[in-house]
Amino acid sequence: QDKQEGKSLQLTIDQRLQAIAYRAIKQAVADHRATSGSVVMLDVKTGAVLAMVNAPSYNPNNRTDWQSYKMRNRVITDSMEPGSTIKPFVILAALENGVADKDTIVDTGNGVLRLGGSRVRDVSWVGKASLSMILKKSSNIGVTKLAMQMPVEALLGLYSSVGFGELSGLNLVGEVTGIFPTRTRWSPIERATIAFGYGLSITPIQLAHAYATLGNLGKYEPIHIIESNDRDMSRQVVSKENARLVLDMLETVTQKGGSARRAAVPGYRVGAKTGTSRKASAGGYSDEYITYTAGLAPVSDPRIALVVIVNEPQGDDYYGGSVASPVFSEIMKGALQILNVAPDENKFQQ
């Protein structure tokens, strides 16, 4: 039998993007004395993984550096409650299920909502708010009221359609699906918490994939890390019109008064959402936090989906907007320049 030449294996990872992402997250972990940090970047149009980094990391050529906690690819092996980064998808579900439209106003009351024996609180009072304002001010009550107006299956169905609760398809060792709730009976507070990112857990790669689907105007593109041309398994999972509405709302979060204003990149339209979730521990929640920023750029025609996670930052500064967002901005700025994405000078919303 004649010998066959081996085929070359080419990754979609861009070495330049990998380098700026690793440098930024390594610095952030050191600055905030955090336990770990992760970054994943996807090409919105193709689903290609452009960068995937973790800190602490290790040098595979140096065996003395091989410690298990350094060798985990946390982007796929670690699942966590997504906190407020999930809120754009609640608004998307409300639009898709006809319980809200672009002009809907939600009355969030005095900032405290009683549900049975529990309470849902907002960090800042928003009163009667548009969908855009609910996202901009990250109102827990706003998304709770939207979630209560649709069957729980409708919200979970949308979460599932953008990739939550499913393996990414990258076929990398150690990947987990996260924890996706499947109960048959839901209390009001359980329905509320899944709307602001508690009660389910997802991986960083799933979060990036969901944002990429939003940026691709509702077209779900399977993600891949090995270059290959023989794939077109994309499918439209939400309407283009509703995805565009949510994208434009997401942009307001990086503008003045928004929780992700430190994720902005000068000259570009950026849409991003921050999240801060308390870590689950035996019997409840601990005093440790995970901070996130997830988003897209440029909003005019999204090219890059990016998720930045800083795990257990120490000190008084533990919000996603102040810990993860500056890292997001630094990486996104470098990536847009490296990929020669033209600035948005004339495309800003009036």
Language-model segments: residues:
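Conserved, well-ordered alpha-helix/loop/beta-strand core segments that scaffold catalytic motifs
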Residues: Q1-G37
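Beta-lactam-recognizing serine transpeptidase/beta-lactamase-like catalytic domain environment
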Residues: Q1-Q4, I13, V39-S84, F89-P313, ...
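Solvent-exposed, charged/polar functional surfaces in cytosolic regulatory/catalytic domains
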Residues: A24-Q27, T252, K256, G334
